[in-house]
């Protein structure tokens, strides 16, 4: 190989690396940075909602500020195992389903499960407490409406869903790959206890911060091992090691709460 050809390849590699870095650094989770969360709305015209939107997520969820609504009922979901890929966006690790991974029904509208994002620490807080991890299951209806189901985690036993994906997640930190085929992935492995949950209207938690998102946040906390969270953190860039957006104002929004009532057994 001639020296000029080698130089050309080095320049191309440098340019490619620079482009990838720029994509990853479009926004940061580090408060005080020029591209930090308080400035997202000023970085691009199409991200203006991040700064000016009135229904932004995440928010603080407090039991003493909710509207109890028993008509919500248990979640009507029907998930199925299907081929999926893992993608490293630089800001988070996500699972993207290639086929029909099943659906969630809200107000008689079917929302197809599309992808799952992971954020550590959690983005939502519950009664003043922030948790070690949050999984966000993004769903989409035929008319492009979106609904997100959120699971909060504390350190404890390993999460079975992430356990099946650990070997794939490791590859992100040991190679330059940003997309990996994960084979068949079963969303039913997720620890979803829908006997109690919060619901409110909000937004996506990363630019462009699109509003009109129906959020359902599980009240019961699941468990994840510290090692599993570490693997997720090692995969992303340094601006997203703690990839949780700061809490946003509730702005007079209603937060509804469902809890399944325990049946009472009467002695005769």
Swiss-Prot record:
Catalysed reactions, as listed in the record: hydrogencarbonate + H(+) = CO2 + H2O; 2 monodehydro-L-ascorbate radical + NADH + H(+) = 2 L-ascorbate + NAD(+)
Q: In which tissues is it expressed?
A: Expressed in tuber (at protein level).
The family database entries (InterPro entries) matched by this protein are listed as: Alpha_CA_prokaryot-like, CA_dom, CA_dom_sf, Carbonic_anhydrase_a-class
PTM note says: Not glycosylated.
One MF term in the entry's GO annotations: zinc ion binding
* Disulfide cysteine pairs (residue numbers): 50-209
Keyword annotations: Allergen, Antioxidant, Disulfide bond, Lyase, Oxidoreductase, Signal, Storage protein
What single Pfam family name could you report for this chain, choosing any that match? Carb_anhydrase
The record places domain Alpha-carbonic anhydrase at 25-259
Q: What is its EC number?
A: 1.6.5.4, 4.2.1.1
Q: Which CDD domains match?
A: alpha_CA_prokaryotic_like
- The entry's active site is 91 (proton acceptor)
Gene Ontology biological process terms, A to Z: carbon utilization; cellular oxidant detoxification; cellular response to carbon dioxide; one-carbon metabolic process; positive regulation of gene expression; positive regulation of phagocytosis; response to oxygen radical
- Cite the binding residues for L-ascorbate: 92, 117-119, 136, 205-206
Q: PROSITE patterns of this UniProt entry?
A: ALPHA_CA_2
Subunit text: Monomer. Homodimer.
Question: Which protein family is it in?
Answer: Belongs to the alpha-class carbonic anhydrase family.
Instruction: Report the function annotation for this chain.
Output: Storage protein of tuber. Involved in protection against oxidative stress. Has carbonate dehydratase and weak trypsin inhibitor activity detected by measuring the dehydration of sodium bicarbonate and the inhibition of trypsin-catalyzed hydrolysis of N-benzoyl-L-arginine-4-nitro anilide, respectively. Contrarily, no carbonate dehydratase or trypsin inhibitor activity detected by measuring the hydrolysis of 4-nitrophenyl acetate or the inhibition of bovine trypsin-catalyzed hydrolysis of N-benzoyl-L-arginine ethyl ester, respectively.
Q: Write the protein's name.
A: Dioscorin DB3S
Organism (species) = Dioscorea polystachya (Chinese yam)
């Amino acid at each position: 190989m001639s020296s000029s050809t080698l130089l050309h390849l080095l320049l191309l590699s440098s340019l490619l690396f620079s482009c990838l870095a720029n994509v990853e650094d479009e926004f940061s989770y580090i408060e005080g940075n020029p591209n930090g969360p308080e400035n997202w709305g000023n970085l691009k015209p199409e991200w203006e909602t991040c700064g000016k939107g009135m229904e932004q997520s995440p928010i603080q969820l407090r039991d003493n500020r909710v509207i109890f609504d028993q008509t919500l009922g248990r979640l009507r979901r029907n998930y199925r195992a299907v081929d999926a890929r893992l993608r490293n966006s630089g800001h988070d690790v996500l699972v993207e389903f290639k086929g029909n991974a099943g659906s969630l029904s809200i107000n008689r509208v079917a929302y197809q499960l599309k992808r799952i994002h992971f954020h550590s620490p959690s983005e939502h807080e519950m009664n003043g407490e922030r948790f070690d991890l949050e999984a966000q299951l993004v769903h989409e209806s035929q008319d492009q409406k979106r609904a997100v189901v959120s699971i909060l985690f504390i350190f404890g036993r390993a999460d079975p869903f992430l356990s099946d994906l650990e070997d794939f997640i490791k590859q992100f930190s040991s190679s330059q790959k940003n997309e990996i085929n994960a084979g068949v992935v079963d969303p039913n492995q997720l620890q979803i206890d829908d006997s109690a949950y919060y619901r409110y209207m909000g937004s996506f938690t990363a630019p462009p911060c699109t509003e009109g998102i129906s959020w359902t946040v599980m009240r019961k906390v699941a468990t994840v091992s510290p090692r599993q969270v570490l693997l997720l953190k090692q995969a992303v860039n340094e601006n997203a090691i703690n990839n949780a957006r700061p809490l946003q104002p509730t702005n007079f929004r209603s937060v509804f709460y469902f809890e399944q009532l325990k049946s009472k057994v009467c002695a005769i």
